Amino acid sequence: MSTQVKPGNWDTAAAITVNEICSQVEQMYSESEDVETQAGLNEEAIELEIENNFDVLVDILFHSEENKVEEALIEQIFFHIACLSMRGYSLNAEKTHGNSAAIIYDTVLGKQRMYGHGNIARFEIPGIAIRLNDKLERLKNLRRWDGPVLFEPMKDTWLDICGYSVIAIMWLREWFLLNLKNQETTGKPTGAK
């Protein structure tokens, strides 16, 4: 899962992360006849698996008595949540995994351009977990009401869950604070004079 590649910018780091997730999703949900694999074809089953993984993550981050939390385990959990949510997005949006990966990449890149590093850097992984909890609760609420609530489509929620998981993986790999590609040469945000 964790790669030895050292990206030079945020864009490349996000692309590497999203492509790893997409490759894993395509392996998990190939044209297999395996009943275990096919169980993941249902959005409700995917949501339940994400919730189970997220509960473990919350216990590790907020209820563990150990001083040193195992970052490799945390990355593994976020990676699994990212795979599951990419699959959920693909099913809900009726897109291929490759098309979903491109949309997820464009979304996280666009959000990074809008928000910068500060919104994640201040609270790090615990902050990402809290944001992810908000999205999981929204997913439950959308399912409870069987559709969009206040114009929030379910596919956007799947996209957000995957996006925050991608960001968490990048943070754990120490890639999140890299400059965007268009900031490499000047060190200034786009449009800065």
Sequence positions of predicted segments:
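Intrinsically disordered, low-complexity regulatory regions
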Residues: 2-193
